[in-house]
Design a protein with these regions (language model features):
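Conserved catalytic or regulatory cores that recognize and/or transform ribose-phosphate-containing ligands
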Residues: 1-122
Length: 122
């Protein structure tokens, strides 16, 4: 079963809910870093947050990145995964993909369902 890390802004609950459902339907295992919820208490926990995220990315086969709005953490997670040879697929929500997004992503998809299909493969 393909493990897929959900990269996205911390408050993107709807993205995480929809992506989780679509990934399950596609036979993938979503890995949501927000289950380790650090919202409102990041100060002093930066190392734990980042190292936890990196370890989870390393444990996955792919990253589904929500690039519907700018987010520093999402960009760093996608860049890290790309550098490790882990497949990255970007969900843009119809927003123009930034050149860096195009560079690191195997596919940039306007629709979340299309992004999941690109990850799940044949």
């Amino acid at each position: 079963m393909k493990r897929v890390y959900l990269a996205g802004p911390p408050f993107a609950e709807e993205y995480r809910r929809r992506a989780t459902a679509l990934l399950h339907e596609a036979g993938c295992e979503p890995v949501d870093p927000m289950r380790r919820d650090f919202r409102g208490r990041t100060e002093g926990n930066e190392r734990e947050i980042v190292e936890g995220d990196l370890a989870e990315i390393d444990s996955c086969d792919a990253v589904l990145a929500d690039f519907t709005r700018p987010d520093e953490g999402t960009a760093m997670e996608a860049w890290y995964a790309h550098g490790r040879g882990i497949q990255v697929v970007a969900y843009t929500g119809g927003q123009p993909a930034h050149p860096w997004t195009v560079y690191v992503a195997a596919a940039a998809c306007d629709e979340l369902a299309a992004a999941v299909r690109a990850l799940a493969g044949p």
